[in-house]
Amino acid sequence: GVADEAQKCGYEQPKVINVGELDEDEAEDLPIVRAQYNAADASYWAVYGSDYFYSKMSGAEKQFYQALYDVNMSFLTGNKSAGYKTFDSARHYHSGFVSIGSLDLDTALEVAKILQMSNPQFYFVNEEMLYGVNSDGKYQLALGVYNTCSNGGARADKTNGIKNKLDSWVASIKSKATILDMEQEAHDIIMRNCWYSEAGSYHQSSAGVLLEGKAVCAGYAETFEMLCNAVGIQTVCVTSSSHEWNKVKLYGRWYAVDCTWDDDKDDKTGTVYGYMYFNVSDNYSDEYSKWSHTAESWWSSYSVPVCENDKVITDRDYNYQGVDYSSVFDVDYYLKTYPDIKAAFGADENQAFMHFINCGMAEGRQGKSSFNVISYKNRYKDLRMAFGNNLRSYYLHYISNGKAEGRKATGDVAITDGVSVYNGVDYSAVYNYSYYIKKYPDIAKAFPNDDISTLAHFVTCGMNEKRQGNMNFDVNSYYNRYADLRSAFGTNWSAYYLHYIQNGKAEGRKGTGTKSI
Protein backbone atom coordinates (compact mmCIF):
# COMPACT_ATOMS: atom_id res chain seq x y z
CA GLY A 1 0.00 0.00 0.00
CA VAL A 2 0.98 3.65 -0.34
CA ALA A 3 1.77 4.17 3.31
CA ASP A 4 4.08 1.18 3.37
CA GLU A 5 5.80 2.14 0.12
CA ALA A 6 6.46 5.62 1.46
CA GLN A 7 8.57 4.11 4.19
CA LYS A 8 10.62 1.94 1.82
CA CYS A 9 13.53 4.34 1.61
CA GLY A 10 16.27 2.41 3.36
CA TYR A 11 19.32 3.50 1.38
CA GLU A 12 22.10 4.52 3.78
CA GLN A 13 24.60 7.19 2.81
CA PRO A 14 28.19 5.94 2.90
CA LYS A 15 29.94 6.30 6.24
CA VAL A 16 33.20 8.06 5.41
CA ILE A 17 35.96 7.27 7.90
CA ASN A 18 39.31 9.06 8.10
CA VAL A 19 41.80 6.42 9.27
CA GLY A 20 44.77 8.78 9.32
CA GLU A 21 48.24 7.77 8.14
CA LEU A 22 48.56 4.51 6.24
CA ASP A 23 51.34 1.99 6.78
CA GLU A 24 53.67 1.29 3.87
CA ASP A 25 52.22 -2.17 3.30
CA GLU A 26 48.72 -0.72 3.00
CA ALA A 27 49.53 1.50 0.03
CA GLU A 28 48.33 0.25 -3.32
CA ASP A 29 50.44 -2.02 -5.51
CA LEU A 30 48.32 -2.30 -8.64
CA PRO A 31 50.74 -4.46 -10.70
CA ILE A 32 50.55 -7.08 -7.96
CA VAL A 33 46.76 -6.69 -7.72
CA ARG A 34 46.31 -7.14 -11.45
CA ALA A 35 48.60 -10.16 -11.48
CA GLN A 36 46.21 -11.79 -9.02
CA TYR A 37 43.32 -11.55 -11.48
CA ASN A 38 41.64 -14.75 -12.49
CA ALA A 39 40.84 -13.59 -16.02
CA ALA A 40 38.08 -16.11 -16.68
CA ASP A 41 36.35 -15.36 -13.38
CA ALA A 42 36.76 -11.61 -13.88
CA SER A 43 35.18 -11.89 -17.33
CA TYR A 44 32.25 -13.83 -15.87
CA TRP A 45 31.58 -11.25 -13.17
CA ALA A 46 32.07 -8.19 -15.39
CA VAL A 47 28.78 -8.77 -17.25
CA TYR A 48 26.78 -8.02 -14.10
CA GLY A 49 28.04 -4.45 -13.92
CA SER A 50 27.39 -1.29 -15.92
CA ASP A 51 29.93 1.05 -17.51
CA TYR A 52 27.37 3.76 -18.31
CA PHE A 53 28.53 6.26 -15.69
CA TYR A 54 32.18 5.31 -16.21
CA SER A 55 31.79 6.43 -19.83
CA LYS A 56 30.72 9.90 -18.61
CA MET A 57 33.81 10.44 -16.44
CA SER A 58 36.94 12.52 -16.98
CA GLY A 59 40.30 10.87 -17.60
CA ALA A 60 41.42 11.26 -13.97
CA GLU A 61 38.10 9.91 -12.70
CA LYS A 62 38.35 6.91 -15.02
CA GLN A 63 41.90 6.19 -13.85
CA PHE A 64 40.83 6.10 -10.20
CA TYR A 65 37.67 4.13 -11.01
CA GLN A 66 39.66 1.51 -12.94
CA ALA A 67 42.21 1.12 -10.14
CA LEU A 68 39.46 0.68 -7.56
CA TYR A 69 37.68 -1.76 -9.88
CA ASP A 70 40.84 -3.83 -10.27
CA VAL A 71 41.37 -4.04 -6.51
CA ASN A 72 37.81 -5.19 -5.90
CA MET A 73 37.70 -7.60 -8.83
CA SER A 74 40.89 -9.17 -7.49
CA PHE A 75 39.23 -9.38 -4.08
CA LEU A 76 36.12 -10.98 -5.62
CA THR A 77 37.93 -13.57 -7.72
CA GLY A 78 40.69 -14.35 -5.20
CA ASN A 79 40.71 -15.67 -1.67
CA LYS A 80 42.89 -13.16 0.17
CA SER A 81 41.54 -11.89 3.45
CA ALA A 82 40.51 -8.28 3.88
CA GLY A 83 42.73 -5.66 5.41
CA TYR A 84 41.42 -3.69 8.34
CA LYS A 85 41.91 -0.47 10.25
CA THR A 86 41.00 -0.06 13.89
CA PHE A 87 38.90 3.02 14.58
CA ASP A 88 36.84 3.78 17.70
CA SER A 89 37.93 0.43 19.14
CA ALA A 90 36.41 -1.47 16.21
CA ARG A 91 37.90 -3.18 13.18
CA HIS A 92 36.83 -1.75 9.86
CA TYR A 93 37.58 -4.20 7.05
CA HIS A 94 38.36 -3.10 3.51
CA SER A 95 39.22 -4.62 0.12
CA GLY A 96 42.32 -2.49 -0.51
CA PHE A 97 43.48 1.13 -0.67
CA VAL A 98 43.86 2.99 -3.96
CA SER A 99 45.43 6.38 -4.67
CA ILE A 100 42.90 9.02 -5.70
CA GLY A 101 45.52 10.55 -7.99
CA SER A 102 44.83 14.15 -8.97
CA LEU A 103 41.20 14.07 -7.79
CA ASP A 104 39.97 15.98 -4.78
CA LEU A 105 38.58 13.82 -1.99
CA ASP A 106 34.92 14.73 -2.56
CA THR A 107 35.11 13.78 -6.23
CA ALA A 108 36.93 10.55 -5.38
CA LEU A 109 34.15 9.65 -2.95
CA GLU A 110 31.55 10.26 -5.68
CA VAL A 111 33.47 8.04 -8.10
CA ALA A 112 33.75 5.36 -5.42
CA LYS A 113 29.98 5.49 -4.84
CA ILE A 114 29.36 5.14 -8.56
CA LEU A 115 31.77 2.22 -8.78
CA GLN A 116 29.99 0.40 -5.96
CA MET A 117 26.51 0.98 -7.43
CA SER A 118 27.68 0.18 -10.97
CA ASN A 119 29.26 -3.10 -9.87
CA PRO A 120 26.84 -4.90 -7.55
CA GLN A 121 28.80 -8.09 -8.16
CA PHE A 122 31.08 -6.64 -5.45
CA TYR A 123 28.48 -7.87 -2.97
CA PHE A 124 30.97 -7.83 -0.08
CA VAL A 125 31.17 -4.01 -0.07
CA ASN A 126 29.31 -2.42 2.83
CA GLU A 127 28.30 1.23 3.36
CA GLU A 128 31.71 2.32 4.67
CA MET A 129 34.43 4.18 2.80
CA LEU A 130 37.85 4.54 4.39
CA TYR A 131 40.47 7.08 3.46
CA GLY A 132 43.92 7.95 4.70
CA VAL A 133 47.22 9.44 3.59
CA ASN A 134 50.40 7.64 2.58
CA SER A 135 53.93 8.68 3.50
CA ASP A 136 53.91 11.25 0.68
CA GLY A 137 50.79 12.89 2.06
CA LYS A 138 48.63 11.62 -0.83
CA TYR A 139 45.07 10.46 -0.25
CA GLN A 140 44.23 6.77 -0.62
CA LEU A 141 40.69 5.38 -0.49
CA ALA A 142 39.22 1.93 0.14
CA LEU A 143 35.75 0.41 0.10
CA GLY A 144 34.56 -1.15 3.35
CA VAL A 145 33.87 -4.88 3.53
CA TYR A 146 31.28 -6.74 5.63
CA ASN A 147 32.95 -8.50 8.57
CA THR A 148 31.49 -11.83 7.45
CA CYS A 149 33.18 -11.42 4.05
CA SER A 150 36.61 -10.53 5.41
CA ASN A 151 37.95 -14.10 5.56
CA GLY A 152 39.09 -15.30 2.13
CA GLY A 153 37.86 -18.87 2.45
CA ALA A 154 34.46 -17.95 3.85
CA ARG A 155 34.05 -15.29 1.17
CA ALA A 156 34.90 -17.81 -1.57
CA ASP A 157 32.06 -20.03 -0.32
CA LYS A 158 29.65 -17.07 -0.40
CA THR A 159 30.82 -16.13 -3.88
CA ASN A 160 30.21 -19.65 -5.13
CA GLY A 161 26.72 -19.69 -3.61
CA ILE A 162 25.89 -16.36 -5.22
CA LYS A 163 27.23 -17.56 -8.58
CA ASN A 164 25.07 -20.68 -8.50
CA LYS A 165 21.96 -18.65 -7.72
CA LEU A 166 22.73 -16.06 -10.39
CA ASP A 167 23.30 -18.76 -13.01
CA SER A 168 19.91 -20.27 -12.20
CA TRP A 169 18.09 -16.93 -12.23
CA VAL A 170 19.77 -15.72 -15.42
CA ALA A 171 18.86 -18.98 -17.18
CA SER A 172 15.23 -18.43 -16.19
CA ILE A 173 15.35 -14.87 -17.51
CA LYS A 174 16.93 -15.92 -20.81
CA SER A 175 14.20 -18.52 -21.32
CA LYS A 176 11.64 -15.75 -21.83
CA ALA A 177 10.65 -14.77 -25.35
CA THR A 178 11.11 -11.01 -25.67
CA ILE A 179 13.23 -8.27 -24.15
CA LEU A 180 10.27 -7.04 -22.09
CA ASP A 181 9.52 -10.58 -20.95
CA MET A 182 13.13 -10.98 -19.82
CA GLU A 183 13.10 -7.67 -17.97
CA GLN A 184 9.83 -8.59 -16.25
CA GLU A 185 11.23 -11.97 -15.18
CA ALA A 186 14.23 -10.20 -13.59
CA HIS A 187 11.77 -8.02 -11.67
CA ASP A 188 9.56 -10.97 -10.69
CA ILE A 189 12.43 -13.20 -9.54
CA ILE A 190 13.36 -10.55 -6.98
CA MET A 191 9.72 -10.24 -5.94
CA ARG A 192 9.45 -14.00 -5.45
CA ASN A 193 12.70 -14.39 -3.55
CA CYS A 194 13.14 -11.30 -1.38
CA TRP A 195 11.33 -9.48 1.43
CA TYR A 196 11.85 -5.85 2.36
CA SER A 197 13.75 -5.81 5.66
CA GLU A 198 16.37 -3.75 7.43
CA ALA A 199 17.21 -6.73 9.63
CA GLY A 200 19.36 -8.62 7.13
CA SER A 201 23.14 -8.87 7.47
CA TYR A 202 23.64 -7.47 3.95
CA HIS A 203 20.53 -5.33 3.53
CA GLN A 204 22.45 -2.59 1.63
CA SER A 205 23.92 -5.10 -0.84
CA SER A 206 22.86 -7.48 -3.57
CA ALA A 207 24.02 -10.18 -1.14
CA GLY A 208 20.93 -9.39 0.93
CA VAL A 209 18.71 -10.61 -1.90
CA LEU A 210 21.01 -13.38 -3.12
CA LEU A 211 22.09 -14.91 0.19
CA GLU A 212 19.34 -14.05 2.66
CA GLY A 213 16.26 -12.96 0.71
CA LYS A 214 16.13 -9.81 2.86
CA ALA A 215 17.15 -6.33 1.74
CA VAL A 216 16.19 -2.68 1.47
CA CYS A 217 15.97 -0.61 -1.70
CA ALA A 218 19.73 -0.75 -2.31
CA GLY A 219 19.69 -4.56 -2.41
CA TYR A 220 16.60 -4.67 -4.64
CA ALA A 221 17.98 -2.12 -7.11
CA GLU A 222 21.47 -3.56 -7.30
CA THR A 223 20.21 -7.12 -7.81
CA PHE A 224 17.87 -5.94 -10.57
CA GLU A 225 20.82 -4.14 -12.16
CA MET A 226 22.86 -7.36 -12.05
CA LEU A 227 20.16 -9.53 -13.60
CA CYS A 228 19.31 -7.10 -16.39
CA ASN A 229 22.90 -6.35 -17.35
CA ALA A 230 23.70 -10.08 -17.35
CA VAL A 231 21.22 -10.61 -20.18
CA GLY A 232 22.20 -7.47 -22.09
CA ILE A 233 19.58 -4.97 -20.86
CA GLN A 234 21.51 -1.81 -19.97
CA THR A 235 20.59 -0.88 -16.41
CA VAL A 236 21.98 1.54 -13.81
CA CYS A 237 21.28 2.48 -10.20
CA VAL A 238 20.57 6.03 -9.02
CA THR A 239 20.11 7.40 -5.49
CA SER A 240 18.29 10.17 -3.71
CA SER A 241 19.36 11.08 -0.21
CA SER A 242 17.58 8.01 1.19
CA HIS A 243 16.43 5.81 -1.69
CA GLU A 244 17.92 3.75 -4.54
CA TRP A 245 16.17 2.67 -7.75
CA ASN A 246 16.94 1.78 -11.36
CA LYS A 247 16.92 3.23 -14.84
CA VAL A 248 16.67 0.77 -17.72
CA LYS A 249 17.30 1.23 -21.44
CA LEU A 250 14.74 -0.49 -23.67
CA TYR A 251 14.52 -0.10 -27.45
CA GLY A 252 16.75 2.97 -27.32
CA ARG A 253 14.84 4.83 -24.56
CA TRP A 254 15.27 4.98 -20.77
CA TYR A 255 12.63 4.04 -18.18
CA ALA A 256 12.51 4.17 -14.39
CA VAL A 257 12.00 0.95 -12.41
CA ASP A 258 11.55 0.66 -8.65
CA CYS A 259 11.36 -2.99 -7.60
CA THR A 260 11.23 -2.00 -3.94
CA TRP A 261 8.02 -0.03 -4.29
CA ASP A 262 6.47 -2.71 -6.50
CA ASP A 263 6.89 -5.20 -3.64
CA ASP A 264 3.68 -5.13 -1.58
CA LYS A 265 4.43 -8.25 0.43
CA ASP A 266 4.05 -8.37 4.18
CA ASP A 267 3.73 -11.28 6.60
CA LYS A 268 0.13 -11.82 5.52
CA THR A 269 0.09 -11.16 1.79
CA GLY A 270 2.76 -13.64 0.73
CA THR A 271 3.74 -13.10 -2.91
CA VAL A 272 1.76 -9.94 -3.70
CA TYR A 273 3.55 -7.55 -6.02
CA GLY A 274 2.69 -5.21 -8.84
CA TYR A 275 4.13 -3.09 -11.65
CA MET A 276 3.16 0.44 -10.63
CA TYR A 277 6.80 1.59 -10.76
CA PHE A 278 7.89 -0.60 -13.68
CA ASN A 279 9.08 1.17 -16.86
CA VAL A 280 7.74 4.64 -16.11
CA SER A 281 8.91 8.22 -16.57
CA ASP A 282 10.81 10.36 -14.09
CA ASN A 283 7.64 12.40 -13.65
CA TYR A 284 5.53 9.40 -12.70
CA SER A 285 5.30 10.26 -9.04
CA ASP A 286 2.84 11.16 -6.37
CA GLU A 287 3.38 13.57 -3.51
CA TYR A 288 5.62 11.38 -1.40
CA SER A 289 7.67 9.92 -4.24
CA LYS A 290 8.88 13.23 -5.68
CA TRP A 291 11.56 13.65 -3.07
CA SER A 292 12.27 9.91 -2.97
CA HIS A 293 13.08 9.79 -6.68
CA THR A 294 14.99 13.04 -7.06
CA ALA A 295 18.62 12.19 -7.72
CA GLU A 296 21.18 13.71 -5.36
CA SER A 297 22.73 16.86 -6.77
CA TRP A 298 26.19 15.35 -7.27
CA TRP A 299 24.78 12.99 -9.92
CA SER A 300 24.41 15.97 -12.26
CA SER A 301 28.09 15.66 -13.21
CA TYR A 302 27.52 12.19 -14.68
CA SER A 303 24.59 12.57 -17.12
CA VAL A 304 21.91 10.56 -15.33
CA PRO A 305 19.57 9.10 -17.99
CA VAL A 306 16.29 10.97 -18.47
CA CYS A 307 13.11 8.87 -18.54
CA GLU A 308 10.36 10.61 -20.54
CA ASN A 309 7.75 7.91 -21.24
CA ASP A 310 5.24 6.17 -18.99
CA LYS A 311 4.77 3.35 -21.48
CA VAL A 312 7.44 1.38 -23.30
CA ILE A 313 7.79 2.32 -26.96
CA THR A 314 9.02 -0.76 -28.80
CA ASP A 315 9.59 0.94 -32.16
CA ARG A 316 13.21 1.85 -32.08
CA ASP A 317 15.73 3.40 -34.41
CA TYR A 318 17.44 0.76 -36.55
CA ASN A 319 19.60 3.19 -38.50
CA TYR A 320 23.20 2.19 -39.11
CA GLN A 321 25.64 4.06 -41.32
CA GLY A 322 22.84 5.87 -43.11
CA VAL A 323 20.64 2.82 -43.72
CA ASP A 324 17.31 2.28 -41.93
CA TYR A 325 16.92 -1.46 -41.34
CA SER A 326 13.51 -1.25 -39.64
CA SER A 327 11.72 -2.79 -42.64
CA VAL A 328 13.80 -5.99 -42.35
CA PHE A 329 14.72 -6.14 -38.66
CA ASP A 330 12.98 -6.27 -35.30
CA VAL A 331 15.12 -7.24 -32.33
CA ASP A 332 12.44 -9.18 -30.45
CA TYR A 333 11.61 -11.25 -33.54
CA TYR A 334 15.30 -11.95 -34.16
CA LEU A 335 15.99 -13.09 -30.59
CA LYS A 336 12.84 -15.20 -30.49
CA THR A 337 13.54 -16.85 -33.85
CA TYR A 338 17.20 -17.72 -33.24
CA PRO A 339 18.03 -19.34 -29.89
CA ASP A 340 21.75 -19.24 -30.70
CA ILE A 341 21.61 -15.44 -30.98
CA LYS A 342 19.70 -15.18 -27.73
CA ALA A 343 22.14 -17.54 -26.01
CA ALA A 344 25.05 -15.42 -27.22
CA PHE A 345 23.65 -11.94 -26.59
CA GLY A 346 20.67 -12.33 -24.26
CA ALA A 347 18.56 -9.19 -24.57
CA ASP A 348 21.40 -6.97 -25.78
CA GLU A 349 19.62 -5.11 -28.56
CA ASN A 350 22.73 -3.53 -30.04
CA GLN A 351 24.74 -6.74 -30.21
CA ALA A 352 21.83 -8.59 -31.79
CA PHE A 353 21.39 -5.76 -34.33
CA MET A 354 25.10 -5.70 -35.18
CA HIS A 355 25.09 -9.48 -35.60
CA PHE A 356 22.25 -9.13 -38.09
CA ILE A 357 24.17 -6.49 -40.04
CA ASN A 358 27.58 -8.17 -39.93
CA CYS A 359 26.55 -11.82 -40.20
CA GLY A 360 22.81 -12.44 -40.18
CA MET A 361 21.98 -11.03 -43.62
CA ALA A 362 24.83 -12.92 -45.28
CA GLU A 363 23.56 -16.09 -43.57
CA GLY A 364 20.02 -15.47 -44.80
CA ARG A 365 18.54 -15.03 -41.32
CA GLN A 366 15.07 -13.58 -41.04
CA GLY A 367 15.09 -10.36 -39.04
CA LYS A 368 11.39 -9.53 -39.21
CA SER A 369 8.17 -11.46 -39.78
CA SER A 370 7.34 -9.41 -42.88
CA PHE A 371 10.59 -10.06 -44.76
CA ASN A 372 12.04 -13.45 -45.67
CA VAL A 373 15.06 -13.14 -47.92
CA ILE A 374 14.64 -16.61 -49.46
CA SER A 375 11.03 -15.84 -50.36
CA TYR A 376 12.08 -12.49 -51.84
CA LYS A 377 14.83 -14.17 -53.83
CA ASN A 378 12.49 -16.94 -55.00
CA ARG A 379 9.77 -14.56 -56.18
CA TYR A 380 11.77 -12.08 -58.25
CA LYS A 381 13.81 -13.30 -61.19
CA ASP A 382 15.13 -9.82 -61.96
CA LEU A 383 16.71 -9.66 -58.51
CA ARG A 384 18.25 -13.12 -58.82
CA MET A 385 19.79 -12.14 -62.12
CA ALA A 386 21.17 -8.97 -60.54
CA PHE A 387 22.33 -10.33 -57.18
CA GLY A 388 22.74 -14.09 -57.57
CA ASN A 389 23.49 -15.58 -54.15
CA ASN A 390 24.61 -12.31 -52.56
CA LEU A 391 21.84 -12.47 -49.96
CA ARG A 392 22.74 -9.18 -48.30
CA SER A 393 21.87 -7.35 -51.53
CA TYR A 394 18.27 -8.58 -51.39
CA TYR A 395 17.76 -7.05 -47.94
CA LEU A 396 19.26 -3.75 -49.09
CA HIS A 397 17.15 -3.74 -52.26
CA TYR A 398 13.97 -4.22 -50.25
CA ILE A 399 14.98 -1.39 -47.91
CA SER A 400 15.85 1.05 -50.70
CA ASN A 401 13.32 0.08 -53.40
CA GLY A 402 11.37 -3.13 -52.94
CA LYS A 403 9.09 -2.10 -50.10
CA ALA A 404 8.17 1.18 -51.82
CA GLU A 405 7.51 -0.74 -55.06
CA GLY A 406 5.06 -2.99 -53.22
CA ARG A 407 7.09 -6.13 -53.73
CA LYS A 408 6.03 -9.14 -51.69
CA ALA A 409 8.64 -10.52 -49.29
CA THR A 410 7.00 -13.62 -47.77
CA GLY A 411 5.19 -16.76 -48.86
CA ASP A 412 7.30 -18.06 -51.77
CA VAL A 413 8.86 -21.28 -50.55
CA ALA A 414 10.31 -22.23 -53.94
CA ILE A 415 11.38 -20.63 -57.22
CA THR A 416 8.50 -20.89 -59.68
CA ASP A 417 9.93 -18.82 -62.53
CA GLY A 418 13.53 -19.89 -62.95
CA VAL A 419 15.99 -17.97 -65.09
CA SER A 420 16.62 -19.33 -68.57
CA VAL A 421 19.05 -16.76 -70.04
CA TYR A 422 22.76 -17.51 -69.69
CA ASN A 423 25.52 -15.37 -71.25
CA GLY A 424 22.97 -13.72 -73.50
CA VAL A 425 21.44 -16.96 -74.81
CA ASP A 426 17.82 -17.83 -73.98
CA TYR A 427 17.66 -21.57 -73.28
CA SER A 428 13.90 -21.68 -72.58
CA ALA A 429 13.29 -23.80 -75.69
CA VAL A 430 15.31 -26.65 -74.17
CA TYR A 431 15.29 -25.89 -70.46
CA ASN A 432 12.90 -25.28 -67.56
CA TYR A 433 14.26 -24.89 -64.03
CA SER A 434 11.41 -26.63 -62.21
CA TYR A 435 11.42 -29.56 -64.65
CA TYR A 436 15.20 -29.96 -64.46
CA ILE A 437 15.50 -30.12 -60.65
CA LYS A 438 12.51 -32.47 -60.41
CA LYS A 439 13.98 -34.84 -62.99
CA TYR A 440 17.50 -34.75 -61.53
CA PRO A 441 17.56 -34.83 -57.72
CA ASP A 442 21.37 -34.79 -57.76
CA ILE A 443 21.26 -31.35 -59.35
CA ALA A 444 18.64 -30.10 -56.88
CA LYS A 445 20.84 -31.30 -54.02
CA ALA A 446 23.99 -29.75 -55.48
CA PHE A 447 22.38 -26.33 -56.08
CA PRO A 448 19.54 -25.95 -53.56
CA ASN A 449 17.12 -23.15 -54.39
CA ASP A 450 19.60 -21.70 -56.88
CA ASP A 451 18.25 -21.36 -60.40
CA ILE A 452 21.27 -19.43 -61.67
CA SER A 453 23.82 -22.08 -60.71
CA THR A 454 21.44 -24.79 -61.91
CA LEU A 455 21.19 -23.18 -65.36
CA ALA A 456 24.96 -22.76 -65.45
CA HIS A 457 25.33 -26.47 -64.74
CA PHE A 458 22.90 -27.32 -67.53
CA VAL A 459 24.80 -25.19 -70.04
CA THR A 460 28.34 -26.21 -69.06
CA CYS A 461 27.74 -29.86 -68.13
CA GLY A 462 24.15 -31.00 -68.51
CA MET A 463 23.94 -30.66 -72.27
CA ASN A 464 27.17 -32.59 -72.79
CA GLU A 465 25.76 -35.26 -70.46
CA LYS A 466 22.58 -35.41 -72.62
CA ARG A 467 20.37 -34.35 -69.71
CA GLN A 468 16.83 -33.40 -70.61
CA GLY A 469 16.08 -29.80 -69.68
CA ASN A 470 12.34 -29.65 -70.38
CA MET A 471 9.47 -31.81 -71.61
CA ASN A 472 9.70 -30.49 -75.19
CA PHE A 473 13.28 -31.41 -76.03
CA ASP A 474 15.12 -34.72 -75.67
CA VAL A 475 18.54 -34.63 -77.31
CA ASN A 476 18.50 -38.40 -77.94
CA SER A 477 15.26 -38.08 -79.93
CA TYR A 478 16.58 -35.08 -81.86
CA TYR A 479 19.76 -37.01 -82.69
CA ASN A 480 17.81 -40.08 -83.80
CA ARG A 481 15.35 -38.17 -85.98
CA TYR A 482 17.63 -35.93 -88.04
CA ALA A 483 20.41 -37.42 -90.16
CA ASP A 484 21.60 -34.01 -91.35
CA LEU A 485 22.30 -33.01 -87.77
CA ARG A 486 24.11 -36.28 -87.04
CA SER A 487 26.33 -35.62 -90.05
CA ALA A 488 27.02 -32.07 -88.91
CA PHE A 489 27.47 -32.55 -85.14
CA GLY A 490 28.29 -36.19 -84.52
CA THR A 491 28.39 -36.69 -80.75
CA ASN A 492 28.87 -33.02 -79.91
CA TRP A 493 25.70 -33.11 -77.86
CA SER A 494 25.55 -29.47 -76.86
CA ALA A 495 25.44 -28.52 -80.55
CA TYR A 496 22.04 -30.24 -80.93
CA TYR A 497 20.56 -28.15 -78.10
CA LEU A 498 21.94 -24.95 -79.61
CA HIS A 499 20.69 -25.86 -83.07
CA TYR A 500 17.18 -26.40 -81.76
CA ILE A 501 17.29 -23.07 -79.95
CA GLN A 502 18.66 -21.10 -82.91
CA ASN A 503 17.00 -22.88 -85.85
CA GLY A 504 15.28 -26.15 -85.16
CA LYS A 505 12.30 -24.93 -83.23
CA ALA A 506 11.60 -22.17 -85.78
CA GLU A 507 11.91 -24.75 -88.59
CA GLY A 508 9.24 -26.86 -86.93
CA ARG A 509 11.59 -29.71 -86.13
CA LYS A 510 10.34 -32.13 -83.51
CA GLY A 511 12.34 -32.44 -80.27
CA THR A 512 10.77 -35.56 -78.73
CA GLY A 513 9.25 -38.96 -79.57
CA THR A 514 11.92 -40.63 -81.76
CA LYS A 515 13.39 -43.56 -79.85
CA SER A 516 15.67 -44.93 -82.58
CA ILE A 517 17.40 -43.94 -85.80
Show which residues each predicted segment covers.
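Hydrophobic/aromatic-rich core segments of domains that either
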Residues: 219-286
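Secreted/periplasmic proteins that engage bacterial cell-wall peptidoglycan
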Residues: 188-198, 218-229
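N-terminal accessory/pre-domain segments preceding catalytic cores
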Residues: 1-177, 290-322
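Charge-rich, low-complexity intrinsically disordered regions
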Residues: 320-517
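Catalytic cysteine-centered active-site loop
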Residues: 197-207, 214, 235-242
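Secondary-structure boundary elements
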Residues: 154-209
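Repeated polar recognition positions within modular binding domains
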Residues: 99, 191-201, 212-213, 262, ...
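A short, highly charged nucleic-acid-interacting micro-segment common to nuclease
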Residues: 104, 206-220
